């Protein structure tokens, strides 16, 4: 829905989807679509889940980085997030070649082989924070914060990139909201409002 709104209100913006069906694409393929089309921005939309935990809540966004939480507990939290998001790598037959520089299952992660461009990092973080503001305002969902972590699909892209976690499907009330017409309307509106604020800031830079 967000793409449709953007197309109608800003015909100058070309919206490219990595997929429009439930057909599985590897993380590498998703990033490659963006890179091949020289995209100015990459947004990956996900639904969160925690096994055996039914109380976790919140809309979250991620940009590429080492993870801002420190200490032994913090390192484990950072690693757990990266492992959840990167775990699909191991479903790919050639993952050892494609992701040679990314260990998605290590307890301590060597996150960045190269430091991403300052401009991309700055823009990614800015959009991440806008998403937190606008999506939570539109939906009334709990603000889970803007975070940094070693997520493969972000590392593989060559432009400002963010990953969004709409909520926890493992928490009944969050799952219920994501399946309502209200959720289907207000999440896209929040995405759109954040995108427009981002576009206004960086359109000609």
Task: Pin down the residues of each PLM region.
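Active-site-proximal helix/loop segments of hydrolytic enzymes
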Residues: 1-205
């Amino acid at each position: 829905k967000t793409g449709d709104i953007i197309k109608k209100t800003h015909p100058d913006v070309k919206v490219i989807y990595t997929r429009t069906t439930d057909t599985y694409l590897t993380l590498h393929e998703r990033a490659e679509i963006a890179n091949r089309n020289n995209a100015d921005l990459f947004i990956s939309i996900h639904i969160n889940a925690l096994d055996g935990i039914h109380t976790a809540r919140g809309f979250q966004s991620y940009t590429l980085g080492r993870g801002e939480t420190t200490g032994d507990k913090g390192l484990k939290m950072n690693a757990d997030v990266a492992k959840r998001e990167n775990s699909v790598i191991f479903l790919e037959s050639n993952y050892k070649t494609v992701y040679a520089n990314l260990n998605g299952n290590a307890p301590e992660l060597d996150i960045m082989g190269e430091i991403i461009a300052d401009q991309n990092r700055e823009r990614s973080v800015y959009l991440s924070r806008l998403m937190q503001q606008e999506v939570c305002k539109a939906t009334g969902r709990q603000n889970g914060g803007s975070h940094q972590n070693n997520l493969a699909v972000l590392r593989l892209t060559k432009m400002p990139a963010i990953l969004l976690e709409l909520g926890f499907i493992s928490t009944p009330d969050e799952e219920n909201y994501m399946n309502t017409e209200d959720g289907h309307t207000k999440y896209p509106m929040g995405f759109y409002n954040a995108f427009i604020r981002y576009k206004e800031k960086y359109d000609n830079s």
